[in-house]
From Swiss-Prot:
HAMAP family: His_tRNA_synth. The keyword Cell cycle does not apply. The keyword Ion transport does not apply. Homodimer. Belongs to the class-II aminoacyl-tRNA synthetase family. This is Histidine--tRNA ligase. It comes from the Bacteria. GO terms for cellular component: cytoplasm.
Amino acid sequence: MKFSIPPGVFDIIPTNTQEIWKSSYLWDFVERTIRKTVRDYGYQEIRTPLFERTELFQRSVGETSDIISKEMYTFEDKGGRSMSLRPEGTAPVMRSFIENQLHTIAPLQKLFYIAPMFRYERAQAGRYRQHHQFGAEAIGNSSPEQDAELIDLLYTLYKRLGLQNLSLNINSIGTISCRHTFRQALKDYLKPHLNNLSSDSQNRFETNPLRILDSKNAQDKQIVADAPSILDFLDEDSQIHFEQLKKLLKQLKIPYQVNPLLVRGLDYYNKTVFEVVVGELGAQNSIGGGGRYDGLLRELGGPDLPSIGFGTGIERIIQTMINQGIPLPSPCHPSLFLIPMGDEAKQLCFTLTHELRQQGIPTQMDFSGKKLGKVLQYADQIESTYVVVIGENELQTQEIELKELASGKKYKLTIDELAPTLKN
């Protein structure tokens, strides 16, 4: 039987010439840039399990969300407990925060993760059943400055990676009481149009009418264009918070648009929500986003602490870099390829390879024993910078010839001079 990869997932291999975004050296570059950026902002890594109790996501994400109703990978373990592969990163981080009592260590916790997420979705550009997400969460501060810092972190990452033509959309969805009043006004507006809404939006009319606002259906978009605005229903505290956030973004020179239709897809958000969109991702033009969820910790049985976070898909970041023609890093190649000719030379090369690696010089050695022409061809295929052949003559004289493969230049030196020469 010949096995193939399941639908909706993919392999990340060293170099993928057909679909370059699936090349691991690009992922390594993006992840290293992420780690450098989050540490500049004082965020620390957190890692949580691939699966959690299903109830965690039901309580946090919301029973009426698409994730819970359509997209979760759920199974029963041998103990009869319902478990789910994590569909998003915030709920597991909150669970870990509570369970490990992180609030007792410091009043403000700034955490980040890079991890795979799982959703059973229809395959389309930018959407996969396993996708990889970078997320950050700031727990313990309710200020608009914290909101602005988190948005600045995400925006800075995109800029460091060279992304262009980004649009930051922001909105405030206020408090629960604000949304309760707005929800009724929205339903009153939508009711005469109910039969003209898409089937998804008709289903959401009773359970989660705010989600109709960000429907991608063209007919739905026409209908909600004249709907009441959540911004007209904000309480004074939410209004002040949102106005201050806008001032801070201007201060940071981060361009933004206020989008009153932006509500995000998860039920736990309040006050600030934001989304970054780009035009090169097919049907899905959102590259990342997030918002504030001040009541989530309390809802999960933890302390009543304010929180804000975001998530951004690594697949989408890399695809956008490629689509925008951003200069990409090159794969890592060995600096030196050693070719021994004979058993005695093989012993020397084996020790020499180890010593060079210990000094931080990427080195490979031929173990195949094939003819010299074949080995040189292989060294060229893996794009080695230099090659050295060591045979009986080199063993006797302790002198070698260092050849630069790209130019063909040759340098005479002793074996002892090899490491300092390569370092310089």
